[in-house]
């Protein structure tokens, strides 16, 4: 069994200060982000992701939404692009070419959530992930798609799962058949479990247990005490993670851990 490298980060002091100091100072060098999400019954996740990414300091963002949302979203966001949707208002398979083009443009992409449950959308999302070489951060109900279709994680680029502990339980139970993960684990047990899940899924994991935020990547795990119980943590963390990965693609573990610190600092400033 591979050993685990464990880093504890204080909410007042970054574990990787050099990364914080080297953050780009201009929009031109701050990365390009593609945000994907929404359906006729929900649009909050992609719009909130856009807002958080702007606060995090991303250079340029595009928000890809189903065309069925244009009449609503057009009044709320001016950077939206609208791709083919199904009759029920979810993403259609016909959107693949446009999404792949936008993913190629981007330094990272966040599949923010509010996709709804649609079989055609599931096919589209799997095709997008498998054919794109852009780092992808998955959140909200996108994690449920992955748990149902774990082959979505079989890709050449980095995949980051920003998942609740209950979603990780479902993922473990339905797909990777790892030892059970539970809410009553102590920190040492959870660190080992997250390391194993990350390696088994060939993805990075960000999750929350009580007020602790964990990052797991290729045998490395960090833990940061947020000292808050933020209900928006998934969308917010995914947005900050995507921004930091866009700017620091060669240092994923440090970037994701620093994204946690950065998001908590921004929360204090609000």
Task: For every predicted segment, state its role.
Residues 107, 164-165:
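Short loop/turn segments at strand-loop or loop-helix junctions that form parts
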Residues 157-158, 166-168:
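PIN/NYN-family metal-dependent endoribonuclease catalytic core
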Residues 1-126, 151-157, 172-270:
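Small-residue (G/A/S/T)-rich helix-start motifs and N-terminal tracts that mark the onset
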